[in-house]
Amino acid sequence: MARNDIRPIIKLKSTAGTGYTYVTRKNKRNNPDRITLKKFDPIVRKHVEFREER
């Protein structure tokens, strides 16, 4: 298997509507569903939920 098949690069987009994104890798075997993480959005200066964008 290729490196990108197991751990592809994904974008995490802010739910605050600012358009701010984080880029990370995800293990498809352990997390087949979409990821949601609480991270800092510097545009609104708060911790908000970021969801995986496909």
Swiss-Prot record:
Cited Pfam families: Ribosomal_L33
Any one GO BP annotation for this protein: translation
InterPro entries reported for this sequence: Ribosomal_bL33, Ribosomal_bL33_CS, Ribosomal_bL33_sf, Ribosomal_zn-bd
CC per GO annotation: cytosolic large ribosomal subunit
Alphabetized UniProt keyword annotations: Ribonucleoprotein, Ribosomal protein
UniProt keyword NAD, yes or no: no
PANTHER family per UniProt: 54S RIBOSOMAL PROTEIN L39, MITOCHONDRIAL, LARGE RIBOSOMAL SUBUNIT PROTEIN BL33M
Protein name listed in UniProt: Large ribosomal subunit protein bL33
